[in-house]
Design a protein with these regions (language model features):
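N-terminal catalytic cores of secreted or lumenal carbohydrate-active enzymes
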Residues: 42-255
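Flexible loop/turn segments at secondary-structure boundaries
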Residues: 75-78, 102-106, 147-148, 177-179, ...
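Noncatalytic carbohydrate-binding groove/subsite architecture in carbohydrate-active enzymes
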Residues: 155, 195-327, 332-333
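Solvent-exposed beta-hairpin/edge-strand motifs
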Residues: 442-461
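C-terminal beta-strand-rich structural cap/linker in extracellular carbohydrate-active enzymes
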Residues: 467-490
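Secretory targeting and sorting signals
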Residues: 2-38
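Carbohydrate-binding surface patches
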Residues: 406-445
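Aromatic/acidic polysaccharide-binding cleft in carbohydrate-active enzymes
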Residues: 305, 310-388, 392, 398-411
Length: 490
């Protein structure tokens, strides 16, 4: 059983304690969970890998909302003038609001959080201004813990009728299973009953009230992440575990399911193997549950992964490699959005370490909050650059196709692009040795021209590009992400 982990984010029934720190200014965050010890030094050895790409075997279409980001109303810099450009350049197609566990205490009409700090300039309309500038879609988490169906329906009316924002995706609550039902409490929930049965019953009421205002919206149900605590545990008062109970009651009334993924990596290598080791099984389990309980509507019920991040190495190169692997593996397995936690998260500067020659501030943000120990506000951390590499691989509407590698040390993703081009992402997970990668293709014959190659290298602060190698042989630097762009033979 996986223990309930308290990440560097707001996950408390007493959010005031966490966010009193935010009142002190940028760079203050909730104390973090334990961080895995640095990996032992690795003696460089040659890495050789083969990667086969089947351009005719489609896995998924790159969704417009695939690359997502979380923002939180306690972040006074969430709408900073630099933010829209940074998000747009990273290919951000979805932005989630009002911020994790804060959602279950957030009242949109008064722009307040029960017991919590709300930064000036983070109102819903200001958020929507940023989202529209980015060209992304909002994902809204309605207040289940201390709200009502009527309050949520009022938000839909304001957003989509009064303002015409066209907000499509609405989650009902955040990590509601953390309400004490299973013995751990980090999520606000004022309902007398904390059972999955109660949540599902109320979820149906929320869906009815909100869709009465705008039938075109999509409603998401909070599920536990398959294989992670408390998945599989039957709580007191429920007939089955959380997921089976919720979907048996509400499965026919929802449009997507919601999970979060914070893999626990006990070393750098362990973390970097998690996307391939965990995501396919999780996604298959979710799809099986949907097929079982959603009836004839099952093909239309999506999977939303509305929070992801690593549990360690947050601001250093391992997380820069983890990010694109995480996003793309979820998309390949059917998720329509994968949302990084968080835009800015902050740090108290008490857990600064050195990882692969760079400072790690234990800050869960993808951009610096500008704390005293950190680089300037909005400086991108490695996960930002790793995520931005996805824009070199493909765009919404392109097709993710099968790419298989011969060794876990090098992961691969491929996209068949509009117009017939192909792009391949290679992630070298060895921190010390370059990888020589031999590539082969089915359903695509590459041009003999030297390909364009984009790269994000260890501890770099930008993405580089060059023409190098061939379509069938590339050298991938240690701890780097490269994208090889190929044209078809004419």
């Amino acid at each position: 059983m996986r223990r309930p982990a308290l990440w560097s984010r707001v996950r408390s029934t007493g959010p005031a304690a966490a966010l009193v720190l935010a009142l002190a200014g940028p760079g203050i965050a909730v104390p973090s969970s334990a961080v895995a010890a640095p990996a032992a030094p690795i003696t460089p050895t040659a890495v050789s890998a083969s990667v086969s790409v089947d351009a005719g075997r489609a896995l998924a279409t790159v969704p417009a909302t695939g690359v997502g980001m979380n923002v939180a109303v306690y972040d006074g810099n969430m709408n900073h003038p630099s933010v829209p450009g940074l998000l747009k350049d990273a290919g951000t197609g979805a932005v989630r609001y009002p911020g994790g566990s804060y959602a279950d205490g957030y009242h949109w009409q008064t722009h307040t959080v029960e017991g919590g700090y709300v930064a000036p300039g983070t109102e819903f309309d200001a958020f929507m201004g940023t989202v529209r500038t980015v060209g992304a879609q909002p994902i809204i988490t309605a207040n289940y813990g201390s709200g009502t169906p009527e309050e949520a329906a009022g938000w839909v009316r304001y957003a989509n009728v009064t303002k015409g924002y066209g907000v499509k995706y609405w989650e009902i609550g955040n990590e509601v299973y953390g309400n004490g039902l299973y013995g751990a409490t980090w999520e606000t929930d004022h309902h007398a009953s904390k059972t999955a049965t109660t949540y599902a019953t109320n979820l149906v009421r929320y869906a009815a009230a909100m869709k009465a205002v705008d039938p075109s919206i999509r409603i998401g149900a909070v599920l536990t992440t398959p294989g992670a605590w408390p998945d599989g545990i039957t709580g007191t008062g429920d007939p089955a575990d959380w997921n089976h109970t919720v979907l048996s009651i509400a499965g026919a009334k929802i449009d997507f399911v919601v999970v979060h993924h914070y893999p626990i990596g006990n070393s750098q290598a362990d973390l970097l193997g998690k996307p391939q080791a965990e995501i396919p099984g999780m996604a298959a389990t979710l799809r099986s549950l949907i097929d079982r309980y959603a009836g004839g509507n099952a093909p239309n019920v999506g999977i939303a992964v509305t929070e992801v991040n690593a549990n360690a190495y947050k601001n250093t190169s391992p997380n820069g490699l983890f990010a694109p692997d995480e996003y793309l593996t979820w998309m390949e397995n059917g998720a329509f959005t994968v949302d990084w936690w968080n835009l800015h998260n902050g740090t108290d500067c008490t857990h600064v370490t050195t990882v692969e020659g760079a400072k790690d501030y234990d800050d869960g943000g993808i951009l610096s909050s500008g704390a005293s120990c950190e680089p300037a506000l909005n400086t991108p951390f490695p996960p930002y650059w790793g995520t931005r590499m996805i824009t070199k691989l493909g765009a919404p509407g392109d097709v993710l196709v099968r790419a298989a590698g011969s060794t876990p040390a090098v992961s691969a993703h491929a996209v068949r692009r509009a117009g017939g081009d192909l792009a391949v992402m290679l992630v070298n997970k060895d921190p010390a040795a370059d990888a020589t990668v031999t590539l082969s293709y089915a359903g695509f014959t590459p041009s003999s021209a030297t390909p364009t190659v984009f790269s994000y290298r260890k501890n770099a602060t930008s993405i580089g590009s060059t023409t190098t190698g061939t379509a069938t042989r590339q050298t991938v630097p240690a701890y780097s992400v490269v994208v090889v762009q190929l044209r078809p033979a004419r």
